[in-house]
From Swiss-Prot:
InterPro entries to which the protein is assigned, alphabetical: Growth_fac_rcpt_cys_sf, IGFBP-like, Kazal_dom, Kazal_dom_sf, PDZ, PDZ_6, PDZ_sf, Peptidase_S1_PA
Taxonomy of the source species: Eukaryota, Metazoa, Chordata, Craniata, Vertebrata
Keywords: Cytoplasm, Disulfide bond, Growth factor binding, Hydrolase, Protease, Secreted, Serine protease, Signal
Region (Serine protease): 200-360
Subcellular location: Secreted; Cytoplasm, Cytosol
Limits of the PDZ domain: 361-463
Gene3D superfamilies per the UniProt record, alphabetical: 2.30.42.10, 2.40.10.120, 3.30.60.30, 4.10.40.20
Disulfides per UniProt: C29-C54, C33-C56, C38-C57, C45-C60, C68-C85, C79-C106
UniProt function note: Serine protease with a variety of targets, including extracellular matrix proteins and proteoglycans. Through cleavage of proteoglycans, may release soluble FGF-glycosaminoglycan complexes that promote the range and intensity of FGF signals in the extracellular space. Regulates the availability of insulin-like growth factors (IGFs) by cleaving IGF-binding proteins. Inhibits signaling mediated by TGF-beta family members. Consequently, may regulate many physiological processes. Intracellularly, degrades TSC2, leading to the activation of TSC2 downstream targets.
Identification of the protein by name: Serine protease HTRA1B
PANTHER family: SERINE PROTEASE FAMILY S1C HTRA-RELATED, SERINE PROTEASE HTRA1
Gene: htra1b
UniProt key word Hydrolase: yes
Length: 476
């Protein structure tokens, strides 16, 4: 064993010596590096400093267009950071110098123009660094590389980049945004001036200006104003409203053809599909949120809603106040629902597009036959049936949620409506009306239709409060 180790040592020593010689191939390198003997960097050095061929002393690097390479002696110029030494003696200007004895010029590895923080466009990053170094030597602020491409111009996209390949959400938004509208409702105050009292969203379904939105967005029958993505505004007329389905159709008279959105088939949706919600929450136009389909068509049986017209798509895409009426779309840009309500963070609902399709067909038939609907009663509230499962989930998300497992859970109270005037608030749970126990949202709807006045008992926190609400008659 000792003999084997001795033989191995004898073989390796020359190899290690060779490695040292290869590292110190440059003529003139000292045996040991003493940095105290290194010459100072010239003050006019603009390409930055690098270590010399001996990996010992910092020296001024050759800049773009300056000579490089040489005979392999200490002191031969070497290119600075971001540059490479290229020769042009018959082997091409971009061939990197790899052989001793060759000389060339330093060229920038990148030929892409760039923009500096001084607002100037540079041929490449190397030129920017050279100008920045000069500025610092003159006690001026450095120039920062802030953008690929010339100043004032967008960077040319690389089709192979991850951003280009996987930005499918942005592609969807770019496709659908022109057909999404912002809706504002106005009423006159005591001084006979119009003031905005509510807002929402909608989307164009016909080139001549038909727009779909939620019924609760426009049900107050105030003056309705629609603003397009271009900023142009129009007064809208309410063409049809289905309070039960919470869908409305309004129309604007625009002088040009409008971009439209097509309906997809919500019946084909699968849990886990990506969806995009777009609208105007808090009057912030074209606000985009994304998520997945949590459950397809969660409705009557699971939410305790006896009315089969109130089926929902559940999604974790955020839907806020003002986002209502905007489209929920799939990755093909097809509308698969109307953004309708948010129960709590991560639990939002949309009316399925198949329901929208049915509403549009019925609306067309009604208008074709000249049918008019009777007036409907309205209190201005959105609610859903409180089930034990939903109550448990809400208690986990809201510490102050009342200790109740049935009733009608109030999701939103629309401003300037009988519900608000009567004192009803968001997150209240309606537990009885006119002495009758309330176990579902449908019970409340029935009471609104049949009773002139509602004496409602609501659970707010851990307190029962009695409210009086007078339903208002509205045109459909």
């Amino acid at each position: 064993m000792r003999l084997l180790i001795l033989c191995a040592s004898i073989i390796l020593v020359p190899l290690l010596c060779d490695a040292r010689i290869i590292k110190r191939y440059v003529i003139g390198c000292p045996e040991r590096c003493d940095k105290s003997l290194c010459p100072p960097i010239p003050p006019d050095c603009l390409a930055g400093d690098i270590l010399d061929q001996c990996d010992c002393c910092p020296v001024c690097a050759a800049g773009e267009g300056e000579s490089c390479g040489g005979t392999g002696k200490l002191g031969d110029p070497e290119c600075g950071e971001g540059l490479e030494c290229a020769v042009s003696d018959g082997v091409g200007a971009t061939t990197t110098v790899r052989r001793r004895g060759k000389t060339g010029v330093c060229v920038c590895k990148s030929s892409e123009p760039v923009c500096g923080s001084d607002g100037v466009s540079y041929r490449n990053i190397c030129e920017l660094k050279r100008v920045s170094n000069r500025a610092q030597k003159l006690q001026q602020p450095p120039i920062i590389f802030i953008q690929r491409g010339a100043c004032g111009k967008g960077h040319e996209e690389n089709p192979d980049s991850l951003r280009h390949r996987y930005n499918f959400i942005a592609d969807v938004v770019e496709k659908i945004a022109p057909a999404v509208v912002h809706i504002e409702l106005f009423r006159k105050n005591v001084f006979n001036r119009e003031v905005a009292v509510a807002s929402g969203s909608g989307f164009v379904v016909s080139e001549d200006g038909l727009i779909v939105t939620n019924a609760h967005v426009v049900a107050n029958k105030h003056r309705v104003k629609v603003e397009l993505k271009t900023g142009t505004t129009y007064d809208a007329k309410i063409k049809d409203v289905d309070e039960k389905a919470d869908i409305a159709l309004i129309k604007i008279d625009a002088p040009m053809k409008l971009p439209v959105l097509l309906l997809g088939r919500s019946a084909d949706l699968r849990p886990g599909e990506f969806v995009v919600a777009i609208g105007s929450p808090f009057s912030l136009q074209n606000t985009v949120t994304t998520g997945i389909v949590s459950t397809t068509q969660r409705g009557g049986k699971e939410l305790g809603l006896r009315n089969s017209d109130m089926d929902y798509i559940q999604t974790d895409a955020i839907i806020n106040y003002g986002n209502s009426g905007g489209p929920l779309v799939n990755l093909d840009g097809e509308v698969i629902g109307i953004n309708t309500l948010k129960v709590t963070a991560g639990i939002s609902f949309a009316i399925p597009s198949d329901k929208i399709r049915q509403f549009l067909a019925e609306s067309h038939d009604r208008q074709a036959k000249g049918k008019t609907a009777t007036k409907k009663k309205y209190i201005g509230v959105r609610m859903m049936t409180l089930t034990p499962t939903l109550a448990k989930e809400l208690k986990q998300r809201k510490n102050d949620f009342p200790d109740v497992t049935s009733g009608a859970y109030v999701i939103e109270v629309i401003p300037k409506t009988p519900a608000e005037v009567g004192g009803l608030k968001e997150s209240d749970v309606i537990i009885s009306i006119n002495g009758q126990r309330i176990t579902s949202a449908s019970d409340v709807s029935t009471a609104i239709k049949t009773d002139e006045s509602l004496r409602a008992v609501v659970r707010r926190g851990n307190e029962d409060i009695i409210l009086t609400i007078i339903p208002e008659e509205i045109d459909p």
